[in-house]
Regions:
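Extracellular glycan-interaction surfaces
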Residues: 2-70
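Short surface loop/edge beta-strand patches of beta-sandwich-type extracellular domains
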Residues: 18-26, 86-89, 124-129
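Short, surface-exposed beta-strand/loop "edge" segments at domain boundaries and coil↔beta transitions
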Residues: 15-20, 89-92, 146-148
């Protein structure tokens, strides 16, 4: 679960809060590119969860809890997953999402999803070109003709892992 809490970015699991950034995100008109990697087999505890914003790794957290090595988290497990809200229906995302990539079985860096513009130095997204893995998905929200799993929630990774939009 990734959401905003008092203008900070929070990464949480059923085990509790894992990361809460000290950086705040108060510019509601700004565009942000977030990459969260989970790699619980990693021998370095602080590298098991990484948070990147606009291509730069965030290293300052008010809460930093590491999963144990090889710990199975609720992400990518047989539990209900939500995008844009907490499982209880709270913490609704008050913004726009242009796309969501979920890569199963790899802990990738932001360079897989974006790059700095050579002329402006501004971080910009790029289309992911690799494998999504068995449970991976790519939501680009391009078909907004209806709010169904075959339209707005359609998975464009080729895996058919469609989502059912819900208000």
């Amino acid at each position: 679960l990734v959401y905003f809490n008092s203008d900070t970015l929070r990464v949480e699991d059923t085990a509790g809060i894992l990361r809460d950034t000290t950086q705040v995100f108060r510019d509601y008109s700004a565009w942000y590119h977030f990459v969260i990697t989970l790699d619980t087999p990693n021998a370095t505890a602080n590298d098991r969860i990484k948070v990147y914003v606009n291509g730069s790794q965030i290293t300052s957290f008010s809460v930093l809890t590491n999963p144990t090595q090889n710990q199975s988290l609720s992400w990518n497990n047989n539990v209900n997953h939500n995008i844009g809200t907490y499982a209880s229906g709270t913490y609704h995302f008050g913004g726009y999402m242009t796309e969501v990539n979920f890569i199963d079985g790899q802990a990738l860096t932001p360079s897989s999803f974006g790059e700095y513009n050579a002329d402006t130095g501004v971080w910009q997204p790029k289309r992911y070109a690799g494998s999504y893995g068995t449970n991976g998905f790519y939501l680009n929200f391009s078909n907004n003709s209806n709010t169904t799993a075959a339209t707005l929630g359609a998975d464009y990774s080729g895996n058919g892992n469609n989502w059912t939009p819900n208000n």
